C-alpha cells in the first residue's frame, strides 16, 4: 500500500482507547483523506478526551461505541486493531485484512530502527538509548509501547536518523517481516499468561524482533538466550549480555563488573552506577554507544546522571523523612523482587504495598525478599489472593486493605524516619484503576497529600 492510496480505502479502527495510540493512528489516516469507522466497547463518555482530539475530522468519522457491529468488520477494506485485542477475537474473522498501528507505520517508514522488547525494563532502556543517541543523531525519535505512537511523528522523520521503538509481545505478534538494524531483548519472565495460551507462544512473539533481521546486531540477555532463543535462527550477529556473571559458552558477550564494561573479556569503558535496578539498561546503552561509535565519556555522564522515569521505581518525595517510591509499572512478581532488592537497606526498612489483578502468574519469587521486607501491606484483588497464600505458607504477617488510600495511610502511620514505602504491585491494575499509570498517579497524589 502507498501513502496516496489511503484516501481510497475504508478503515475500521478497533479500539480508540484512552492512551493516545488510537488517536494518533486515526489522525494519521484522516489527514490523508481516509474514511473511518471507529469502534470501541467503551462508551462515548469514557472516551470523551479521545473523541475531542478528533473533532477537526468529524465529517470523516462514524463512531460505533459500547459495542461492535459485525457488518463494520465485513465492509472495511482494512481493520486496524489495538494490539491488546487477541488475534482469535470473534469479530476479526470477518476482516478482509488486519493491521496494527505499528505494522501500518512500518509500511511507510524509511528510518533505520533500533527495536527493544523484553518482559521488563523496556521503557527505561529506550529512554536511555534516546538520550545517548541524541548526542550523535539529533533527529532521533522514540515511540512505540512507551506511550507514543510513531505515527504521531511520521511527518517529522528525515529518512536517515535512528528511530527507537519499544515493542511489546502483542505489537510484535503481527510483524512478519520486521527488519531493524539493532534488536534488543532485555529479559524474559512469565507474563501475560491471561493473554497467551502458553509460554511458548509468548516466546515466539518476542522472537519476531530479530528472526527476519538481515543486517546489524541482535542483543539478548545471556540467560534468556540459553533458555529460550538459541533455537531461533538469526541471520545476523548475536551478542549476549550479562548483568554480572556471563554464561560459560562460546558466544560474543558483554557484561558489567563494578561499573566497568567488558566485551569478549576486553575493557571498553566504565560508568558510575548507584542503583542496581538500572544496571541492565545502562550497560546495554553503553554497549550500543560503543557499537555506534558514540562518545563513551558523554554516554557515561548520561548514565551516571540518570534518575529513572515516571512509574518505574520513581522517587516521589520524603514525608517526615519517610521515603516514598512509585513502582506501579512493576506488574509481575519478578520486577517487584528486583525493585525491593535495589532499595535494600542494612536494617531492612522497606514497607511494601503490593497486590492487584491476577495475570495467571505465581508469586513464588516473593520468597527471595521475605527477609528484606519489614511490613507487607496488601491491596485487595484477584492476584492478592495468591499473594496471601504465599505469605501465610511462610507464616508472614500482612495487612489487607480495600483501597490504595487506606494502604498508603497505614504505610505512613507505621513508618519511622528513615523507612522506605515502596508501591510495587506485582500485579495488573484493572479491578480498581484504569491502567497502571492511573494507579501510579493516584499513589503520587495520595503521597503528596500526606504533608
UniProtKB/Swiss-Prot annotation:
Output the InterPro entries linked to this UniProt entry: Mur-like_cat_sf (IPR036565), Mur_ligase_C (IPR004101), Mur_ligase_C_dom_sf (IPR036615), Mur_ligase_cen (IPR013221), MurD (IPR005762)
Q: Name one Pfam family in it.
A: Mur_ligase_M
Instruction: Tell me the protein's name.
Output: UDP-N-acetylmuramoylalanine--D-glutamate ligase
* Cellular localization per UniProt: Cytoplasm
Membrane-spanning segments = none
What does the record give as the function of this protein? Cell wall formation. Catalyzes the addition of glutamate to the nucleotide precursor UDP-N-acetylmuramoyl-L-alanine (UMA).
- Which top-rank group of organisms is this from? Bacteria
Instruction: Provide GO CC annotations from the record.
Output: cytoplasm
What gene name does this entry carry? murD
Q: Name one GO molecular function term.
A: UDP-N-acetylmuramoylalanine-D-glutamate ligase activity
- The EC number on file is 6.3.2.9
Q: Which organism is it from?
A: Borreliella burgdorferi (strain ZS7)
- Asked if the keyword Cell division belongs to this entry, the reply reads yes
Q: Which terms under GO biological process does the entry name? A: cell division; cell wall organization; peptidoglycan biosynthetic process; regulation of cell shape
Alphabetical UniProt keywords? ATP-binding, Cell cycle, Cell division, Cell shape, Cell wall biogenesis/degradation, Cytoplasm, Ligase, Nucleotide-binding, Peptidoglycan synthesis
Q: Which pathway, per its entry?
A: Cell wall biogenesis; peptidoglycan biosynthesis
Q: What reaction is this protein's catalytic activity?
A: UDP-N-acetyl-alpha-D-muramoyl-L-alanine + D-glutamate + ATP = UDP-N-acetyl-alpha-D-muramoyl-L-alanyl-D-glutamate + ADP + phosphate + H(+)
Keyword Cell cycle: yes or no? yes
* Stated family: Belongs to the MurCDEF family.
HAMAP family found in the cross-reference section: MurD
Amino acid at each position: 500500500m502507498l501513502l496516496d492510496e489511503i484516501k481510497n480505502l475504508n478503515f475500521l479502527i478497533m479500539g480508540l482507547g484512552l492512551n493516545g495510540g488510537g488517536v494518533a493512528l486515526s489522525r494519521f489516516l484522516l489527514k490523508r483523506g481516509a474514511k473511518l469507522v471507529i469502534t470501541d466497547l467503551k462508551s462515548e463518555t469514557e472516551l470523551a478526551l479521545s473523541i475531542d482530539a478528533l473533532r477537526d475530522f468529524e465529517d470523516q468519522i462514524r463512531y460505533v461505541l459500547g459495542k461492535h457491529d459485525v457488518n463494520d468488520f465485513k465492509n472495511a477494506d482494512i481493520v486496524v486493531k489495538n494490539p491488546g485485542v487477541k488475534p482469535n477475537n470473534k469479530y476479526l474473522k470477518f476482516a478482509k485484512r488486519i493491521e496494527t498501528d505499528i505494522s501500518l507505520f512500518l509500511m511507510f517508514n524509511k528510518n533505520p530502527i533500533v527495536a527493544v522488547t523484553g518482559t521488563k525494563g523496556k521503557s527505561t532502556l529506550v529512554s536511555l538509548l534516546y538520550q545517548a543517541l541524541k548526542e550523535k543523531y539529533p533527529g532521533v525519535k522514540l515511540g512505540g509501547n512507551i506511550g507514543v505512537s510513531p505515527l504521531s511523528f511520521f511527518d517529522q522523520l528525515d529518512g536517515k536518523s535512528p528511530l527507537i521503538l519499544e515493542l511489546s509481545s502483542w505489537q510484535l505478534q503481527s510483524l512478519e517481516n520486521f527488519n531493524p538494524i539493532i534488536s534488543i531483548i532485555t529479559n524474559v519472565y512469565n507474563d501475560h499468561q491471561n493473554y497467551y495460551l502458553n509460554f511458548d507462544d509468548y516466546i515466539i512473539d518476542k522472537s519476531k524482533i530479530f528472526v527476519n533481521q538481515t543486517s546489524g546486531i541482535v542483543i539478548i540477555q545471556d540467560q534468556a538466550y540459553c533458555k529460550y532463543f538459541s533455537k531461533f535462527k538469526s541471520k545476523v550477529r548475536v551478542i549476549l549480555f550479562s548483568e554480572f556473571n556471563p554464561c560459560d559458552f562460546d558466544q560474543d558477550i558483554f557484561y558489567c563488573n563494578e561499573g566497568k564494561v567488558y566485551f569478549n573479556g576486553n575493557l571498553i569503558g566504565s560508568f558510575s552506577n548507584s542503583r542496581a535496578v538500572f544496571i541492565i539498561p545502562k550497560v546495554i546503552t553503553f554497549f550500543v554507544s560503543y557499537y555506534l561509535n558514540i562518545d563513551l565519556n558523554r554516554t557515561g555522564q548520561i548514565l551516571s546522571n540518570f534518575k529513572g522515569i515516571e512509574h518505574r521505581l520513581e522517587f516521589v518525595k520524603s514525608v517526615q523523612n519517610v521515603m516514598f517510591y512509585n513502582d506501579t509499572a512493576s506488574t509481575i512478581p519478578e520486577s517487584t523482587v528486583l525493585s525491593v532488592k535495589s532499595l535494600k537497606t542494612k536494617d531492612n526498612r522497606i514497607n511494601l504495598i503490593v497486590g492487584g489483578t491476577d495475570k495467571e502468574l505465581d508469586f513464588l519469587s516473593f520468597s527471595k525478599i521475605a527477609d528484606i521486607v519489614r511490613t507487607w501491606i496488601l491491596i485487595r484483588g484477584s492476584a492478592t489472593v495468591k499473594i496471601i497464600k504465599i505469605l501465610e505458607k511462610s507464616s508472614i504477617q500482612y495487612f489487607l486493605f480495600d483501597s490504595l488510600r487506606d494502604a498508603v495511610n497505614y504505610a505512613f502511620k507505621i513508618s519511622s524516619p528513615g523507612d522506605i514505602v515502596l508501591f510495587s504491585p506485582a500485579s495488573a491494575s484493572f479491578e480498581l484503576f484504569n491502567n497502571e499509570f492511573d494507579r501510579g498517579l493516584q499513589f503520587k497524589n495520595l503521597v503528596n497529600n500526606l504533608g
